[in-house]
Amino acid sequence: EVTKPETINYRTLKPEMDGLFCEKIFGPSKDWECHCGKYKRVRHRGIVCERCGVEVTESRVRRHRMGYIKLAAPVSHVWYLKGIPSYVAILLDIPLRDVEQIVYFNCYVVLDVGDHKDLKYKQLLTEDEWLEIEDEVYAEDSTIENEPVVGIGAEALKQLLEDLDLNQIAEELREEITNSKGQKRAKLIKRIRVIDNFLATNAK
């Protein structure tokens, strides 16, 4: 986890520990050399320095090792949103343009219909439509006890993804694939491949 905004120490010109270029997280900046200099050269390959916690390996590992930061609010990663195919759209079974409407705060999405008869789960609503529904729900003569819940932005997508039961969806898709043909079958196969990868790696 990256916990500091610093990049490089201006005195030593070495990456700051726990910063954006941290050697402990991403790997050494020089081949076969730890941060503190205790271990140098290839003979120490694979050793993790007990003093600075940096693994003695090639510096090129920095190109693919990834860290993470904790944010105040969820955001969607552009690789999974805009990539081809869009994994978020495939998992949620929602068209990419609708997913973008939610992420970019253009539309609300229904997370729970409550007692409202005209709403559907994952339905998109404009701000005006949601204001109308709110007026209806909170009217004095309203018969709605369980209020509908809507969300917007990446936080709403996070909630939709958390609501997915991947094992159950995989089972249903396998049954559906046996009775499907053509383009529909290809779409279902694409979706089950993504779900199977999540299940195989136990990703969350």
Swiss-Prot record:
The keyword Zinc applies. The keyword Transcription applies. Keywords: DNA-directed RNA polymerase, Metal-binding, Nucleotidyltransferase, Transcription, Transferase, Zinc. Pfam families: RNA_pol_Rpb1_1. Its EC number is 2.7.7.6. Binds 1 Zn(2+) ion per subunit. Gene3D superfamilies: RNA polymerase II, clamp domain (4.10.860.120). Disulfide bonds: none annotated. Its cofactor is Zn(2+). GO terms for biological process: DNA-templated transcription. It catalyses: RNA(n) + a ribonucleoside 5'-triphosphate = RNA(n+1) + diphosphate. GO terms for cellular component: DNA-directed RNA polymerase complex. It comes from the Bacteria. Zn(2+) binds at C34, C36, C49, C52. DNA-dependent RNA polymerase catalyzes the transcription of DNA into RNA using the four ribonucleoside triphosphates as substrates. PANTHER family: DNA-DIRECTED RNA POLYMERASE, DNA-DIRECTED RNA POLYMERASE SUBUNIT BETA. In cyanobacteria the RNAP catalytic core is composed of 2 alpha, 1 beta, 1 beta', 1 gamma and 1 omega subunit. When a sigma factor is associated with the core the holoenzyme is formed, which can initiate transcription. Belongs to the RNA polymerase beta' chain family. RpoC1 subfamily. This is DNA-directed RNA polymerase subunit gamma. The gene is rpoC1.
